[in-house]
Every structure is written in structure tokens, then in C-alpha cells.
């Protein structure tokens, strides 16, 4: 296996037994592909597919005027270049977006043309600006108003038809009432439902119900047609002396004989007996075609058609009439030879439609349409046209109704049709098919659907949601355009004047800015970013709501297997509604989730990979990834554990059709990062995967010594580390940028063969954590494409590194680890292991006020010199200044209104000048509880406002950086060109040149070194071909110089132009503070197995328990946290971590003892090739082996993949190899007494995380502060600088102690007794420590509320 540049430096030992058939796919594919398909920016304008923006335009255009003589057609669209790049947008608080321009064609037809023919009179084409469309960054996020946001995919109910029942809840009898619902992608919902009396009703858009036959009549069906569609018939002939019924023996089975069945005077079935299959066979054998039936048998049956007296033409009976004795007499009298009755029975041919027709009062199509109109538009008088229009618009016009391709596919599959394509609207056959299927289900043939099945729920990603929003915007525009089109011809308008793009832009802006699914990106660490982009939510517009979602929707469904993670979901009200995509899952063209499987043929597992959606998966038998295979890939066991039709069963190898691709297939990225996940209880695994997302990046990242092997993928795909775009050699490196000279074979002609990577330095993330990148390469290193060049936050040598590997001991320690508390050693704090940097952004805005402009300056009234010492002459703090609470960061003065002055003030003003008093100090100060270092200052100035000195300095520095980048590109390109020129010229005959080069002289290197490089192009050669090549090179160099100039000009223009600020803002200063947070008691820590706790105490190193060799442990955890929580994974991690660390120390000792390289190789071979996947180190040079050993000193990283990890024996073998006790336990000594503890203690290394719940952010105290306006009580919470609530239960406590005076004080002067607290303040100032309590304000509020109920309440004072 080939290792990348960083992988070589530190190889993980992998305990996985199963080969990796399929690499983990790029983790952000869903987001990127969806939006790419929406924009189709990379496709030419005439080659776009009918999806995304293109489809949205095509559905709304052409817009035709009311008269039909003018139409506006859509031709194509194009996206411009964004003005600012991603980083600039973040700094300036702008949206990263590209202008959208649409080419429209206005076609005017001749009004006077003869009817039926259209003559084009005029065509105008014009490009119209349609607002800006936000672009997705390469990491799958959007920058909206300067903040990074993610649009979460939505899991919603797929369009199509669904059959269900009410689970017996509607009616008290517990009878199951079946229903069918047709859900379109857009348009009205159509529901059919049974009532307890077995009639079928229809609802449109959940309005009041109508008999279902009303809808059928509205479609133009007559009673007879309806009956013929839904029922089979029996034919009855009227004979001289009775009635003969055509006999279909199959229909008799299971019925009770109402009369004696006679065959040739032999009674086959007696009256009152049930007809069995034997009787049916006998009847069939007898070959009887008809039976004589008594009249009583026919009474109560229903006629299938209208019966007309042929002689007189008189209507004898209507279709669906019930047969009575009178009717039979009438029929006989009218001379009717035969008639048909509906065949129904109570088992599987219910009379539902017939009973529905009986309650249906409509008799004609028009009546039915009017009835539907009344239901949809109550209170409006119906007309024939209105009723017809409304009905046709409901389900039969493309503008109002669309099933979508998915909906049509699901619809056709469900009603049992072969083809899966068709129109987006419904037709008569569709509605009949739904009704027939519903009746079949009611008759007991067929199953209801499971709406939580992932074949009935689909994923709506960014692109699709953006398209819908865009379409909505366009529809709003359409209405306005239609009205203006009528005047377009007379006034000679152009498309530009017809279209107002504001509604479109507003709809798009609203969606990206404030939709429920457009979320502020969780940027705590790279894992939380990746997870956020892979999240799938059932909430949001068109989805569920928290309150209405029941248990079933939230539950894990068998179809989640390999598609949605069963573990990772939030705790709390959203549990189960927000899920994460499984590692290998992807969405198909229809939006259903698919997961990959290996094909199995005749018991042999192939490497052919097939993606199956939940719909297809049910019909196959699928083996699990851990099924035993022999060397040839045949399934070995006689019975293999597998899944079929959503059930877990056992099956023989020959029946198996597919096999899982990997054991980690079923979990999400976060869960796949938990080692020994298979040994943890699911609830704790859920907490573990959620808490990894809250880990704060530490100052020095340290990758987990026990990992799962997926860490590198996550780190690279998250985009937090920098990956080489093309291979090459490192030309220069410093902390802020890396310059790579690209390999010749990877550059295209004419482009500079240089890649410059600017590193992100100390930037603030959305969660105020610090994003910082550090280079990993040195000058001269050879890189390949995809190698990691720089680590980001929480990555270490290109691997995810969320926390620190700590030496832990499981033992109680003086009660300081009671209830999950965590005891840590002072050494951890001293070594800054869990120190993190947090960056706060503070903003100062200078506005234009009524009294004059606010000013940013260092000239602030009544402020001491010492407070101004950190400001420069512009009044802005220096970068690098260390600031404390209440220090001034930006000096700002605001004009103050004129006030009446006392004579003394007038005198002072006369003596000391005006300035002091007409402005007040409104400077930006450091908030309380925050101290740190200023790391960056940004000044934004409105156009037309002079820039101050500081702004110009910042601008100059930015320009210098741009210039440096461009110069480096040019330098490398020049070097490359001159190298090629030298190769071209040396050794060839010249025809003349600078420095008196003679004709016929051979050009030498010496000659070229004497001539300045710029003059090499003046050399003329004998061969014309060489001269041509020289000219080409000279031209391309000139071209690059020009390109350099233009790019520099562009950048300069961008930097020097004024900023786009909010109205009324003249200047804005942003100051960034870096705050160092050390570990302290009260901070929350956690492992990766849901084992969380709060730091209770930091203990001096000398008091911590220590090992026999004197090593003190770092952390002491409570052993009682393991048994009841059932997360044993943490113990196994601890054991393996100890082995890994021990092996690293052993390698370190060997290196220090200057062991031979061969010995090192042998030892490494023992470690890596002990079991499972082999690592071949023979290709490594000695130097690489030494580098590897140096990196392994801190511990040999291990990977134990989920569900395929290290086994107990392997852990023991590793401990043995590291010369550690195989039990994983050792004797510890008490640091305070030096005595050994009674029993051996489990000790080892665990990867611990510091979570973003820091005591500094939560601790809060109030002396005086704001009060609520109505109740006059102090506000609550840290954000409002509120007080501590002395609540109901606290009052009980004081009452219980009888502390009446303390209680009175709490409820009055310390809370909301306004007079009392003012009086008390006065008393304290006067040194008089008495208090008088008055009526608290909240009592007055209560009195007012009671009075508002018209109950008078008064306070009588004695």
C-alpha cells in the first residue's frame, strides 16, 4: 500500500479483519452535488439538463399576455463572477453570491392576423438582471451576511399515494377505517376514506368530506359505469315458473346456502349449510351452468344497470336499486328476459361503492362539480364555468398540480402498473386505480403502507429547496409581468422594463437568511462541521413539527440500516427527528437514500458493488459484513445471519444475493470515530457521538492513540486541513503560506506552474473557537496530489484530533470523583494540555446622529491617560495589546444634546473651551469577565468618508500580502521559462545577439550567465524553428506580466474602495480578542463513550496516585461510572491505549539506546504485523524509519474499526509486547502517604475531550443591574446581567427555618420594593444600617390583574 506524505510519518496499526472493499466516499458529496446540479454553472448555456434553475425558468416561462398576442420567452441564463471571494465576504459581512442574468425574448404577434394562424410581428431579446444567487463554498457552506451557514437536508414524505388505517382509534367499536391519500409535490391533497358504515368519502385539501362517488360523477361517470368499474355481476334469467341464476361455482365458496342446491333432484348442499371447496368441486364436476333460485334469494340484491321496458320505453328500475318482491313482479310484468345483479359478499367483495351511491345526492356531472365548488369555496355563488374551472384546476392542470417524477414513479408502483414514468397530473384512470386499490385493501387483499419506511420518505437537499423557492419567486413575478405585457406593444417596452426581479431576490434571500433549515454552522471543530452538513432533519417547511411528531416517526426503522445512523441524534425534544447520514449512504436521482452492497452469486461474494434503495432492498436476502468467507470469497457457514423483508433471519449461502460492504456501514461519521463502539450501550454511544461535536480544539492537537482508522478521511474531507491540489516541490514555507512549484506534467500550457496556499491564522469560528493552520512541510519536500500540507484546528498530521490522550486511573479519590466528577492533575494545566484559544469579535459602530456624526478618536472627555495608553492616534487599540475588563478598545464620542447649564458650568465652559461638555464618551470597552490579547483590527469606512491613518495602514499591509503572492507566482513562472530558454539555446548555433555574439557561434552556459536574463530573447538563432519558440516564450512571459498587473490592479481597487455599510453608519471597527482558557474546576470534560463529568478539583502532581516507576496519573475517574452505564468501551480503550503508549515508550528507549535500524524494523514488524491488516515497511528508507520511530515515541496509534475492532486476546498480546501486565491493572501508590492501594487499579490512556461548556462562560455574579419594567424584579440570566431567582422552593426553606426577617428582606428590598431599596441605599451611604420594607411591586401588579377581572381589591392600612 502506498502511503501519503503525512501517513508515512505515523502509521496506524489497524486491527480490522475485513478488507476495505470501498473507500469511504467524500463526505460532503450530498451538499455539493445537489447545489452543483441546481446551478449547472459548469455546463454551456445550450447544454443544460432540465433540472434546477433551468427547470424553474422553463415551468414559469413563457408568460403570455391576457390577450394572447404578446409572450415573454426564456432563452437561457448565465452566472457572473462573484465580486468578493469567500474570505473577503466573511470579513466585510457580505453574502458570497454571483449575479444572475437571464436572456429573455419578447415575441409580439400580429393582432390582425387571420384566426388560427399566428404571425410574428416583432422579436426583442435582452439580458435581464435577476438578483444575486448565493454560491456554495468548496466546503459545502454558504456565506450569508458574513457568517457561514449550512442548509440542512430535509427528510419528508415522498409524493405518491399512501394507504393507511386509523388503527381503530376513530370509532368506539375499534373497527379499522382504511384511507388513501394522494400527495403531490405541489398542489391539492386528495384523500379517500371509509366511515364506520363502510361508505367511501373523499376529501380535498382536508376540507369537509363528500361521498367519493361525487368525484367520480364530476369526472363524467354515470352510475352504471361506476358500478361496472367496481363490481362483478351475476346474470339472472326470468323463466316461466321462477328465476335461473348463472352459476359461477368459485363465487359460492365460504357462503351459507340460502336454499337447497339440487343437481338432478339430488340435494348437494342443504339450506343453511356453509358451502365448502368440496361442494364447489362437485358443482364444477356436474357441469351445471345455472341454478334455479327462489325469489326470496334475490330480494335485497342490487341491480347493476337500469332496466327499461323495451315495448313502452318506460324505465322499470334504476341502476343500484335494491330488488324487492314488487320489483320482481314489475320485471316479470314488463316481460324482461334477464337482468344483472351486483356480486357482493361480506368477506372479500364488499358493497362499499354501492352504499356510497345511495347517499350521493348528485345526479349529473354539473351537480357534482357544483358540490365540489361549494365545498372548496363556501359562501360563493357557483356558476357553471366557475365550477368547471375550479374542478379542472384541482388535479388536471400542470400549473396547479405536479406529482413530480418521484411521485409518478411511487404512484404507478403502488397501484401495480409496470411503467414508472407518466404525466405529472392525475387523470380519471389514476383516481379509479387509487379507489380500486383502497377497496381491495378493505376487502383484505393487500397491505397498508408503513410511512416510516425509508422507501416512503425522501431527502430534499439544498438544490431542490433552492429551486422551489426560486420558482415561488418567479410565480410572483409572473403575475406582475402578465399585466404589463398588455401594454408592452403599444409602449414598445423591453424585457428589462417588464420584469421586476425584486420578488425573486427577496424569496432567495429569505430562504438563505432565515429559513428553518438554513442554520448557523456548528463550527466547534472539523467533525461538527462535517456532521452538520450531513444532517437530515424531519422538521422545517413541509415537514413535521416537534409537537405533532409521535413515537413511530422518531423510532429506528429497519430500513435505516446503512442509510441513516441509528445512534447519532440529539437528546431532548428533537430526538429521532434530526438524524445523520450513514457513512456510505448517498441519495439517488429520486432523492431516496441508497446504501452499497457486494453482489453474491451462488454463495460466492464478488467485488461488484450495487447501491440499493430501501424500496429495492426488501426483496433481497442480504448477509452481514461479518459473515465468514474462505480465501476465494465463498460463504463458509451452513446458516448465515442475514436480512430479508426488513427482518433478521438465518439463511443458507445459496439463497444469499447481497452482502454488506463494511461493518461501519450502519453508523454515521461521528459514531464511526468511537473505538470499541460495539461494547457500548446505545444510549451512551449517542451521548458520545454528540459530545465529540462539542469538543473545543486544544492549543496543541493530539490525535487519539486509540482510533478507528477513519480519522484521516474526516480531517481531509472537513476542509480544515490544507490538501495539495497538484503534486510538486515545496518552494517556500512560512507560518502563513506555502508555495509549491507544480510538476510539469500537471500544469496546463500557459498557466503559471505554481500553487500558493494562504493559511488561515487565528480566525474566529462561529462558536468563537480558534481556527488556525500550521504547515507540515519543509522546503524541498516532494508532494503528490492529495497530500496534507498543513494541519487545521483539531487535526494532527492530517488526522482528526479532538482532545488529548490522558493517563487515567479508575479509582475513588476522597470523594472528589463522586457523581461523575473528574479529578485532574496540576501537570495537565501546567503543560497547557487542555488550554484552548477563544476569539471574541467586538464591534464599534460610528453613526450619523440627529445631533451630528459620532467620531472615533483618542480625544475622549474625562478619561485618564492610563486608559488611553493602548490606543493609537486614531483612537483604536494596538494589535498585541493585552486588555482587561473595562479597558477602552476603540475611543468614540457622541454629540450630546444642549442642556441647560448652571452658572458654574457656564463659567467653566468659558474658561476651558467648548469641547469637553458637548460630547459624551461612548467608547467600546472590554466587557466584564473577558481578558485577552488583541490579535486583529479591521476598519470599515463608508464611501466618501475619509479613511483614518489606521485604516490606511491595514490597507497597505493587505496590498503588500497580495503583491507578495503575485510576485512569487511570477518569479517561479519566470524561472521556469528561463530554464526552458536555456535548454533551448545551449549548444545550438547563433546568428547573432547581445554582447557582440557572432554569427555561427555555439551558445554556451557561460555566455548566458554573462548576459542579463531579460536580453536572452534578443539572441537570434540559425534555425527558424528555435527563433519561433523563443518568440512564443517571450510573448507568454509578457502575457504573464500583464496578467500580474491587471490582477494587482483588481485587488487594489477592491481594497481601496469604500465599504458597503448599513444605512446611517459612517465607520465600523471590529476588534478581535484572543482569550486563553485554561482548564479549571467547573469545566465539562468527556471521553468518547458518553462518559462525561465536571472537573471537581485540580490536584498538585505530588498528591496524585502514581505508578511503581513514579509516573503520576493525569486523571482519576470514578469506577462506578462504568457498570450502570454499560459503556465498557472506555475500559477497553484504556487498556489498548496503555499498550499503545507502552510500545511507543519502548521504541523511544530503543532509539535513545541507538539500536540498529534492523532491530527497529523487526520490532515495528512485530507490532504492525502481529494480526489483522499487514503493513509492509520494506519500501521505507532508513531515514523514513527513524522519522516514523520519532513520531511513534508518544505512542503507536492503533485503529480498531467499529464492529470489527481489536479482541481481548489482541489487546493482551499488545500489552505483553509492551512489557505491561496483561490484566491492564497495576499497583498504584497514594501520592500523599506513599503507601500502595489495597487492590490493583485499572490504568491506561484514554482520549479525553474538553467540551464547549466552560465555567468562564457560565459563571456570573450581580451587584446592581437592570430591573424588569413591569414587576421591577431583577432580570434573569447572564446575558441580561441578571440576579439569582429566589424561587418558591427557596422560600419554603427559609419558612422551614423560621427565618422571617431574612425572608422579608429577600422578598422586598433585595427584589422589587422600589421605595425600600432606594431608601436602603441612602441609609447605607449615611452609615445607618436599618431597613424598612414596603409593598413589593409584584403585589401591585397582582392587584392590577385582579382589578382587570372586574374584582375590586383594596389595601386597607391601619
Curated annotation (Swiss-Prot):
Entry keyword Transcription: yes
**Which Pfam family, any one of them, does this sequence belong to?**
RNA_pol_Rpb2_7
Recorded hits in PROSITE patterns, A to Z, give: RNA_POL_BETA
**SUPFAM superfamilies named among the record's database cross-references:** beta and beta-prime subunits of DNA dependent RNA-polymerase (SSF64484)
Please list the GO terms describing molecular function. DNA binding; DNA-directed RNA polymerase activity; ribonucleoside binding
- Gene Ontology cellular component list: DNA-directed RNA polymerase complex
- GO process annotations (BP): DNA-templated transcription
Q: Does the keyword section mention Transferase?
A: yes
InterPro entries in the record, alphabetically?
A: DNA-dir_RNA_pol_bsu_ext_1_sf (IPR042107), DNA-dir_RNA_pol_bsu_external_1 (IPR019462), DNA-dir_RNA_pol_su2 (IPR015712), DNA-dir_RNAP_su2_dom (IPR007120), DNA-dir_RNAP_su2_hyb_sf (IPR037033), RNA_pol_bsu_bac (IPR010243), RNA_pol_bsu_CS (IPR007121), RNA_pol_bsu_protrusion (IPR007644)
| Enzyme Commission no | 2.7.7.6
Coiled-coil residues are none
Q: Which reaction does it catalyse?
A: RNA(n) + a ribonucleoside 5'-triphosphate = RNA(n+1) + diphosphate
Which protein family is it in? Belongs to the RNA polymerase beta chain family.
PANTHER family xref list: DNA-DIRECTED RNA POLYMERASE I SUBUNIT 2 (PTHR20856)
Subunit structure comment from the entry: The RNAP catalytic core consists of 2 alpha, 1 beta, 1 beta' and 1 omega subunit. When a sigma factor is associated with the core the holoenzyme is formed, which can initiate transcription.
Q: Mind telling me what this protein is named?
A: DNA-directed RNA polymerase subunit beta
Recite the lineage of the species: Bacteria, Pseudomonadati, Pseudomonadota, Gammaproteobacteria, Chromatiales
Q: What gene name does this entry carry?
A: rpoB
Amino acid at each position: 500500500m502506498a502511503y501519503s506524505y503525512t501517513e508515512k510519518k505515523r502509521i496506524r496499526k489497524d486491527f480490522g479483519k475485513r478488507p476495505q472493499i470501498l473507500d469511504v466516499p467524500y463526505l460532503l458529496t450530498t451538499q455539493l452535488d445537489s447545489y452543483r446540479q441546481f446551478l449547472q454553472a459548469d455546463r454551456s448555456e445550450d447544454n443544460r439538463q432540465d433540472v434546477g434553475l433551468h427547470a424553474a425558468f422553463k415551468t414559469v416561462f413563457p408568460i403570455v399576455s391576457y390577450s394572447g398576442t404578446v409572450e415573454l420567452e426564456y432563452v437561457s441564463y448565465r452566472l457572473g463572477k462573484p465580486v468578493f471571494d469567500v474570505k473577503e465576504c466573511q470579513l466585510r459581512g457580505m453574502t458570497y453570491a454571483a449575479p444572475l442574468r437571464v436572456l429573455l425574448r419578447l415575441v409580439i404577434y400580429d393582432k390582425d392576423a387571420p384566426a388560427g394562424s399566428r404571425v410574428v410581428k416583432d422579436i426583442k431579446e435582452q439580458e435581464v438582471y435577476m438578483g444575486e444567487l448565493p454560491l456554495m463554498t468548496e466546503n459545502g457552506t454558504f456565506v450569508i451576511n458574513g457568517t457561514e451557514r449550512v442548509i440542512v437536508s430535509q427528510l419528508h414524505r415522498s409524493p405518491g399515494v399512501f394507504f393507511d388505517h386509523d388503527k381503530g382509534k376513530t370509532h368506539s367499536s375499534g373497527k379499522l377505517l382504511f384511507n388513501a391519500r394522494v400527495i403531490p409535490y405541489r398542489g391539492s391533497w386528495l384523500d379517500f376514506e371509509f366511515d364506520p358504515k363502510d361508505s367511501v368519502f373523499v376529501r380535498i385539501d382536508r376540507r369537509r368530506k363528500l361521498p367519493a362517488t361525487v368525484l367520480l360523477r364530476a369526472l363524467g361517470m354515470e352510475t352504471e359505469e361506476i358500478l361496472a368499474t367496481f363490481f362483478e355481476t351475476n346474470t339472472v334469467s326470468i323463466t316461466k315458473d321462477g328465476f335461473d341464476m348463472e352459476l359461477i361455482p368459485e363465487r359460492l365458496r365460504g357462503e351459507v346456502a340460502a336454499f337447497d342446491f339440487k343437481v338432478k333432484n339430488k340435494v348437494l348442499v342443504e339450506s343453511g349449510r356453509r358451502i365448502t371447496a368440496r361442494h364447489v368441486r362437485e358443482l364444477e364436476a356436474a357441469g351445471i351452468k345455472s341454478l334455479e333460485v327462489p325469489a326470496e334469494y334475490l330480494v335485497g340484491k342490487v341491480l347493476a344497470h337500469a332496466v327499461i321496458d323495451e315495448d313502452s320505453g318506460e324505465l322499470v328500475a334504476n341502476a343500484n336499486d335494491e330488488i324487492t318482491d314488487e320489483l320482481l313482479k314489475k320485471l316479470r310484468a314488463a316481460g324482461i328476459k334477464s337482468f344483472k345483479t351486483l356480486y357482493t359478499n361480506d368477506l372479500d367483495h364488499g358493497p362499499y361503492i354501492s352504499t356510497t351511491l345511495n347517499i350521493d345526492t348528485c345526479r349529473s356531472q354539473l351537480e357534482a362539480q357544483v358540490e365540489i365548488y361549494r365545498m372548496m369555496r363556501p359562501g360563493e355563488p357557483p356558476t357553471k364555468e366557475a365550477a368547471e374551472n375550479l374542478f379542472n384546476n384541482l388535479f388536471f392542470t400542470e400549473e396547479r398540480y405536479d406529482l413530480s417524477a418521484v411521485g409518478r414513479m411511487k404512484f404507478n408502483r403502488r397501484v401495480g402498473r409496470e411503467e414508472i414514468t407518466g404525466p405529472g397530473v392525475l387523470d380519471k384512470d389514476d383516481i379509479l386505480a387509487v379507489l380500486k386499490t383502497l377497496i381491495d385493501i378493505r376487502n383484505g387483499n393487500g397491505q397498508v403502507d408503513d410511512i416510516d419506511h425509508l422507501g416512503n420518505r425522501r431527502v430534499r437537499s439544498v438544490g431542490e429547496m433552492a429551486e422551489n423557492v426560486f420558482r415561488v419567486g418567479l410565480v410572483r413575478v409572473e403575475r406582475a409581468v402578465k399585466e404589463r405585457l398588455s401594454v408592452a406593444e403599444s409602449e414598445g417596452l423591453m424585457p428589462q422594463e417588464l420584469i421586476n426581479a425584486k420578488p425573486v431576490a427577496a424569496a432567495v434571500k429569505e430562504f438563505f437568511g432565515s429559513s428553518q433549515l438554513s442554520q448557523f454552522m456548528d463550527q466547534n471543530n472539523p467533525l461538527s462541521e462535517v456532521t452538520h452538513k450531513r444532517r437530515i432533519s424531519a422538521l422545517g417547511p413541509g415537514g413535521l413539527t416537534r409537537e405533532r411528531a409521535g413515537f413511530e416517526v422518531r423510532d429506528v426503522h429497519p430500513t435505516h440500516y446503512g442509510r441513516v445512523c441509528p445512534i447519532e441524534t440529539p437528546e431532548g425534544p428533537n430526538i429521532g427527528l434530526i438524524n445523520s447520514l450513514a457513512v456510505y449512504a448517498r441519495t439517488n436521482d429520486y432523492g431516496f437514500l441508497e446504501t452499497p452492497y457486494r453482489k453474491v452469486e451462488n454463495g460466492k461474494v464478488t467485488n461488484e458493488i450495487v447501491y440499493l434503495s430501501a424500496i429495492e432492498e426488501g426483496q433481497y436476502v442480504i448477509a452481514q459484513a461479518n459473515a465468514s468467507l474462505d480465501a476465494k470469497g465463498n460463504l463458509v457457514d451452513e446458516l448465515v445471519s442475514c436480512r430479508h423483508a426488513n427482518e433478521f433471519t438465518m439463511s443458507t449461502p445459496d439463497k444469499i444475493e447481497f452482502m454488506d460492504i463494511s461493518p461501519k456501514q450502519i453508523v454515521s461519521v461521528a459514531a464511526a470515530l468511537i473505538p470499541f463502539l460495539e461494547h457500548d450501550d446505545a444510549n451512551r454511544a449517542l451521548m458520545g457521538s454528540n459530545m465529540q461535536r462539542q469538543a473545543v480544539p486544544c492549543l496543541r492537537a493530539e490525535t487519539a492513540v486509540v482510533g478507528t482508522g477513519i480519522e484521516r478521511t474526516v480531517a481531509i474531507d472537513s476542509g480544515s486541513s490544507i490538501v495539495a491540489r497538484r503534486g510538486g516541490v515545496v518552494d517556500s514555507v512560512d507560518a502563513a503560506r506555502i508555495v509549491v512549484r507544480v510538476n510539469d506534467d500537471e500544469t496546463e500550457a500557459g498557466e503559471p506552474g505554481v500553487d500558493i496556499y494562504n493559511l488561515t491564522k487565528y480566525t474566529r469560528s462561529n462558536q468563537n473557537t480558534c481556527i488556525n493552520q500550521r504547515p507540515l512541510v519543509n522546503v524541498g519536500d516532494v508532494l503528490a496530489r492529495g497530500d496534507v500540507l498543513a494541519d487545521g484546528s483539531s487535526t494532527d498530521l492530517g488526522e482528526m484530533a479532538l482532545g488529548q490522550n490522558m493517563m487515567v486511573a479508575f479509582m475513588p479519590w476522597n470523594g472528589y470523583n463522586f457523581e461523575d466528577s473528574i479529578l485532574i492533575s496540576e501537570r495537565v494545566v501546567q503543560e497547557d494540555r487542555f488550554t484552548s484559544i477563544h476569539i471574541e469579535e467586538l464591534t464599534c459602530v460610528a453613526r450619523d446622529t440627529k445631533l451630528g456624526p459620532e467620531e472615533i478618536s483618542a480625544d475622549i472627555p474625562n478619561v485618564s491617560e492610563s486608559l488611553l495608553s493602548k490606543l493609537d492616534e486614531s483612537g483604536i487599540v494596538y494589535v498585541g495589546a493585552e486588555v482587561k475588563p473595562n479597558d477602552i478598545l476603540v475611543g468614540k464620542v457622541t454629540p450630546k444634546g444642549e442642556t441647560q447649564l448652571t452658572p458654574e458650568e457656564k463659567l467653566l465652559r468659558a474658561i476651558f473651551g467648548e469641547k469637553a461638555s458637548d460630547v459624551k464618551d461612548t467608547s467600546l470597552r472590554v466587557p466584564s469577565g473577558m481578558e485577552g490579547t488583541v490579535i486583529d483590527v479591521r476598519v470599515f469606512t463608508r464611501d466618501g468618508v475619509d479613511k483614518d491613518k489606521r485604516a490606511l495602514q491595514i490597507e497597505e499591509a493587505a496590498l503588500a500580502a497580495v503583491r507578495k503572492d503575485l510576485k512569487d507566482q511570477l518569479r517561479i513562472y519566470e524561472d521556469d521559462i528561463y530554464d526552458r530558454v536555456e535548454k533551448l539555446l545551449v549548444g545550438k548555433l547563433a546568428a547573432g545577439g547581445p554582447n557582440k555574439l557572432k554569427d555561427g557561434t555555439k551558445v554556451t552556459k557561460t555566455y548566458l550567465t554573462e548576459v542579463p536574463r531579460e536580453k536572452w530573447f534578443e539572441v537570434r538563432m540559425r534555425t527558424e524553428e528555435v527563433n519561433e519558440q523563443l518568440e512564443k516564450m517571450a510573448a507568454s512571459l509578457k502575457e504573464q506580466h500583464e496578467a500580474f498587473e491587471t490582477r494587482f490592479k483588481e485587488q487594489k481597487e477592491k481594497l481601496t474602495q469604500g465599504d458597503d455599510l448599513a444605512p446611517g453608519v459612517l465607520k465600523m471597527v471590529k476588534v478581535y480578542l484572543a482569550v486563553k482558557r485554561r482548564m479549571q474546576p467547573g469545566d465539562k470534560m468527556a471521553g468518547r463513550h458518553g462518559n462525561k463529568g465536571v472537573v471537581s478539583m485540580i490536584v498538585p502532581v505530588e498528591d496524585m496516585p502514581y505508578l511503581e516507576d513514579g509516573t503520576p496519573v493525569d486523571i482519576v475517574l470514578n469506577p462506578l461510572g462504568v457498570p450502570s452505564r454499560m459503556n465498557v468501551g472506555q475500559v477497553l480503550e484504556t487498556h489498548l491505549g496503555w499498550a499503545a503508549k507502552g510500545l511507543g515508550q519502548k521504541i523511544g528507549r530503543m532509539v535513545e539506546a541507538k539500536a540498529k535500524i534492523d532491530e527497529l524494523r523487526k520490532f515495528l514488524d512485530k507490532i504492525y504485523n502481529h494480526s489483522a491488516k499487514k503493513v509492509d515497511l520494506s519500501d521505507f528508507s532508513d531515514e523514513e524509519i527513524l522519522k516514523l520511530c520519532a513520531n511513534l515515541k508518544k505512542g503507536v496509534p492503533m485503529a480498531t474499526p467499529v464492529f470489527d475492532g481489536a479482541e481481548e486476546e489482541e489487546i493482551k498480546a499488545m500489552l505483553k509486547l509492551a512489557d505491561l501486565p496483561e490484566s491492564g491493572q497495576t499497583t498504584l501508590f497514594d501520592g500523599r502517604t506513599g503507601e500502595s492501594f489495597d487492590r490493583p487499579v485499572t490504568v491506561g490512556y484514554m482520549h479525553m475531550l474538553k467540551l464547549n461548556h466552560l465555567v468562564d462562560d457560565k459563571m456570573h455574579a450581580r451587584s446592581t443591574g437592570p430591573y424588569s419594567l413591569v414587576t421591577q424584579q431583577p432580570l434573569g440570566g447572564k446575558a441580561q446581567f441578571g440576579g439569582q431567582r429566589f424561587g418558591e422552593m427557596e422560600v419554603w426553606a427559609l419558612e422551614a427555618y423560621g427565618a422571617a426577617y431574612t425572608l422579608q428582606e429577600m422578598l422586598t428590598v433585595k427584589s422589587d420594593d422600589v421605595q425600600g431599596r432606594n431608601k436602603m441605599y441612602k441609609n447605607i451611604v449615611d452609615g445607618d444600617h436599618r431597613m424598612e420594607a414596603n409593598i413589593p411591586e409584584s403585589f401591585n401588579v397582582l392587584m392590577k390583574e385582579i382589578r382587570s377581572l372586574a374584582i375590586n381589591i383594596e389595601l386597607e392600612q391601619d
